[in-house]
Design a protein with these regions (language model features):
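Active-site loops and adjacent core secondary-structure elements that bind or stabilize anionic groups
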Residues: 1-87, 96-131, 136, 155-157, ...
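Alpha-helix initiation and N-capping motif
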Residues: 1-2, 100, 115-116, 146, ...
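Short hydrophobic alpha-helical segments enriched in small aliphatic residues
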Residues: 89-91
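Generic structural signal for hydrophobic core residues of well-folded globular domains
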Residues: 110-111, 145, 252
Length: 267
């Protein structure tokens, strides 16, 4: 592995590209997050529709219950929890209501540019082992790049943890503030938001695209969101009921049958 990694570096076999955006953002309703074009917070550039856990909870020792979580819980509400859908932006401004100033980041990274060409050379030489090793290392480099960029965002670009000083072990254990949930993972299992994310970031300009099945190309790529809330942690949405499916279909303005196909693993 180390020998192959050195060849990748010295031979410049792979190219790494990334794009990141930081946007004013607020929770809309209970479960959704709106990313806005500017600080006026009136023009959404992306709406991230959220799913909430629906598990039946057992009481804790003190009689309390753990909440059923949604990623939107970690973003400040629009208009200080007034109903953004019921009020126009002009009416809200007239009453002096302002949304809390929160933000959400979006990112996409790839280290897979060049993999296909080199893999084809290995396969032409019947060297399946190195073809597999190359792809595996490219995948690991993509994860490392995502970690490196997240650190840059926390300490500089967004800067909410400018004084962060963590050891490599602490970084691996994710002891930093904030999370970077990726579409398709347990906390946000809906892959379809990748379409809006890729369009917003213009990922095609850095060589990243989506397949019809919403897989990223090159394969050695990572994309997702940044949430900076100090209490934000990862969780598994798990199974949801038809009531939540129907509610999301209405919010998204899409056919329930189409959404059912997208969320089949969680139904």
């Amino acid at each position: 592995g180390q020998a192959m990694l050195q060849k990748i570096i010295t031979g410049r076999w792979l190219q790494a590209n990334a794009v990141v955006g930081l946007y004013p953002a607020n929770r809309v309703g209970d479960d959704d997050i709106a990313l806005y074009a500017d600080e006026a917070r009136t023009t959404p550039v992306l709406t991230w529709y959220g799913l909430r856990q629906q598990a039946t909870r057992e009481a804790e020792d003190d009689g309390s219950y753990r909440p059923n979580r949604c990623l939107a819980d970690y973003v400040a509400p629009a208009q200080n929890a007034t109903d953004i859908e019921a009020d126009s932006a002009d009416e809200s401004r007239a009453r002096g209501q302002k949304s809390l100033q929160d933000y959400v980041g979006v990112f996409a990274v790839t280290t897979g540019l060049g993999v296909n060409k080199k893999e084809a050379q290995f396969l032409a030489a019947h060297d399946d082992y190195n073809a597999i090793l190359l792809k595996a290392l490219a995948d690991r480099l993509a994860e490392a790049f995502a970690e490196c960029l997240h650190h840059k965002v926390r300490t500089d670009l967004w800067g909410y943890a400018a004084g962060e000083q963590l050891s490599p072990d602490d970084l691996i254990r994710e002891k930093y503030r904030g999370i970077r949930p990726a579409p398709g993972y347990p906390a946000c299992p809906d892959h379809s938001v990748k379409r809006d994310l890729f369009a917003l970031l213009q990922c095609d300009e850095i060589g990243m695209t989506l397949t019809e099945s919403l897989a990223m190309a090159p394969a050695a790529s990572v994309s997702g969101f940044y949430i900076g809330h100090p209490n934000a942690t990862y969780f598994n949405v798990g199974r949801i009921g038809d009531d939540q499916l129907q509610d999301m279909a209405q919010r998204r303005g899409m056919a329930e049958a189409d959404l059912r196909r997208l969320l089949a693993p969680n139904l």
